[in-house]
Amino acid sequence: MIGELLMTAGVLVFLFVAWQLWIGDEIYSAQRTAQAAEQSEEWQAEFEASRPPAPEPDAASEPAAVEPPDMPKPGDAEWFANMHIPRFGADYNYPIAGGVTRANTLDPIGIGHYNDAVMPGQLGNFALAAHRTTYGKPFNRIADLRLNDAIVVESPNGWYTYRFRTLEYVTPDEVDVLSEVPQRPELPADGRYITLTSCSPMFSLAERIVAYGVFESYTPREAGPPAALTEGAA
C-alpha cells in the first residue's frame, strides 16, 4: 500500500514538473508574446492617432541619423518597452519592465531592467535579466546569438537597435558585467551598450551567461519599423 502511494506521488510530481517545464511554459510564453504584440499595436495606434502631416520627402537628401531620446526610469514592475530578437523567431516579442526581482518582474512579466542601469540608447550599459527556463523563458536561446545579430528594443516613441558582439560565462558574483563599460568598472561610459544576463547552465544557478551588444541606431516611430526587425529571423 505504501509502495503504491509512493509510486502515485512520484507520478504526480513528474507530471507537475513536466507541466511546469514544458507544457505550462509554452502556454506562458505564448501569453507573454501575445501581450507584447498587443502593446506594440497599441503604441502604433496611439502614434497614428496623434501623427502630424508628414512633410514631402527630399529625394536629394540622405536620411539623417537621429539622436535617441531619453526615457524616464521605470518604476518597479513598470512595463516600458518590448524586446525583439529576430534570431529567436519572427514573432519574438517580450515585455521589458523595471526591476529584476522574480516576484515582481521576472516571473510575472518577462524581462527585467537593472535599476542602476541606463535606459536604452543612453551612454552606458542598458542591462537586462530574464529566465532561461520556466516562466516563458525569454532568454532561452541566448546562446544561439551570432555576431551582428539585431537586438531591437521598442518603446512608445520608436526602436533602439543594438548589434550582438559576444557571449561570456561568469560566476553570479561578477557584477562588473553591469558596469557602464562592461567588465571595466574603472572606466567612464565611452559607448552605448546592451547586456543580457541569465542563468547557466540550463536548470542551474551555478553561473551566469552574459550577452553583450553595442548600439547601432534609433528609429523614430514616424520613420516606420527598422529593417533590423526582420533580419535573419528564424
Feature locations, PLM:
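Solvent-exposed, non-transmembrane regions of membrane-associated and secreted proteins
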Residues: 11-234
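N-terminal export and membrane-targeting signals
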Residues: 1-9
